[in-house]
């Protein structure tokens, strides 16, 4: 169906690839690139309560959801930014584990040897991303899943998909609560225990030369709380008297904290050795893969534990919970948490290079709320640097939209449906033919990309701009994304039904409105661009789409209707070409 514009489309993709690699790098910076940005007023002074235009409502929803819909835009226009956020926070959380459990029960009822797996975790993710009413909670939970990373790529984690669904639920449940609670829930979750190896971590044994596993102790500081270096509230590095960055922790801190994370294992009605090890089925609680781990005093270190200036005294009887409380209190109270976590949330939701003033305002809101994630999320989304249209128009503002969010934005904008009702999009990790990214399947604990990633040998790198998502953007993934969207726009997305016996891919998009405009190329381009990009389309993209549409011959319908099929195919091809070219354009790939 796309053959008639293959040459033009190929030319466009080459241009898009080059633009994404170069021009986009300059466009995925932050509003704080110059001195003026640092003076942008905070939320109280500079943010209107109601979007002045539908375009601004659409831009807000691009940051706060998995993609704007007309209904979302209408709601934000009716009640305003802050009220919409409050309304979203009040919505009950959707449960991925409940969906997984229901699917598992259905499969086992049909075949006792069968069970649900990773696919059902991804089905639930996309169902909620595309249809869920708690868009903000799910969007923030997804952002948190890229900070507090567990990955189904790991065989232990991937082999326990019910636990992964429960982990995502846990992030959603804590998305607007206390950071201190969130951090403890992360630390005690069995999936994190498996992933970073503090599940069944044993106390030191000098006689055997055994020391506690330090993996989680290191990462909970480096990645989940305080980072490697001491920070100013603005996120800038604190410098010592020697002019060098000051490290937040030492090897001794890691060793001391590692003792805290000994003696933690599966939850259950007792703390028998067999339950700690999970030796037999009778000692394996059905909920053990998603219920917070419990402490087993017989495996917990008795010795003094020193870290970050705190001390847990030697214990006559090991008390894992008391040790953990001191550790969590110490980490959550560290002044680095606000700027360290806040900056990453800004990067995930709004812009890759926020100004120091923006980061400081978010950190201050977090601190004033006593470590309140709700206050942090509001500050991220309502800050004038996030909402000011002039700032957003700056050449270095915004971020490269990651592949998963490009897909969800498209499918939400077009009201995609699922033939099975399950949204069987599945794993999309292949770089050459798919998105090169699958939710909850990062290659390592460092996520798909690092928050401080600077693309080498680029103009952005020379300018000191960060572009995290560019770490998974290269010639192969650009072509893979284009191929995946080409096939998806033409035929649909995902597998051919739950049993692979359906006649078409499960997730379908209707182009009826676009097909009706196929004989009016400019109107067709306007509709597609308004639906997918709004004002972000600019002025250069429309002529390209119009030219591509015109290049597809649309024959006149013969009086006897004998060529109706050819006419219908041409109209459909024109409509799909317009959509496809918008989806691979740099204007869509960059979130402003």
Enumerate the language-model features and the residues they cover:
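Bacterial Sec-dependent N-terminal signal peptides
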Residues: 23-48
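Mature N-terminal segment immediately following signal peptide/propeptide cleavage
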Residues: 51-73
